[in-house]
Amino acid sequence: MMYEMHPDNNMPFEFRFFEYGLDIKGNGVGDDNWEMYIELKRIYGFVRDWYENDDIYHYLSYLFFNFKSKVNFVAIYKTWENSKGKLSFITELKKEISKYILEIYSNDGENNEEPAKEKLKNDLANLSFSWYHNKESLVKILILLDVIYSCKSNYRLPINYFVSKGEDIEHIGCQTPNEEDLNNKAKWLEYIKKLNDYKFDIDKGRLDEWWEKLLKEQEVIDDVTSNIIDELNSYGLNSIGNLVLLHSSQNRSYRNASFNTKKSIIIEDYYNDKYSIRPYTLKAFSSNHTSMWTLEDIKKSTETLAHDIIDFLI
């Protein structure tokens, strides 16, 4: 931080940069080591202020971890210096987060005047939009939800949760068979049989049609299952309201278990300290008090999520 704030074009960043101090005042008095010490104390002071304020801690950590190629310490420091107080600085950080989240919607190349925030809102609320296949943006949104809920509940998000590492994108419910089972006819027949329970409002005649096609197919069922997946996506299977981040080992331990089994394992693991769980993930699984995760649950989850994200952005 010291080097970034007081760079020396004639000296690389290494230990000797600190050896002779800095003539910050430019007075040539010979107290450069003392001046550097005072400056280090000053930097430590405001960085500690940042760390001890929950909002600043969360927003800065989110920016540095998720947009590190675009955010630098000096620019953040100048924003701090030019702010009228902590509340003003917090607002500026929210503006920075909003700018980078909405950037893809501001530069999408389409010739329309629809505001970027409105475009994001539409994608978040659209049940047929496949966020599962838009993983980079999805992860940033899900982590931002952790930040939002942590700030609201006075919970300090662990520093390793500002990035997704060793985690899978998990469907909360209604997931199709695992990748290794995509050609397993028995798994698909079992899945179609359960679709009525998910209350997806799929016409029974359509389900019967899928069932018959699978029964007739002797070996390769890729075409049939891919068509089923495409149609299910339009009902919200891959919408953002049906997706969370979950520890890879935990996710793979129950494979395609029912929602009720999955929910029980996740919450039990959390209370037994077997796995730490992200705030939004825990909220998603604990908010449903029934044994099923239906289309109605996906709709409610999607609406709540879209509202919380759009309400946060400036």
Positions of PLM-derived features:
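Flexible coil/loop and intrinsically disordered segments
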Residues: 1-314
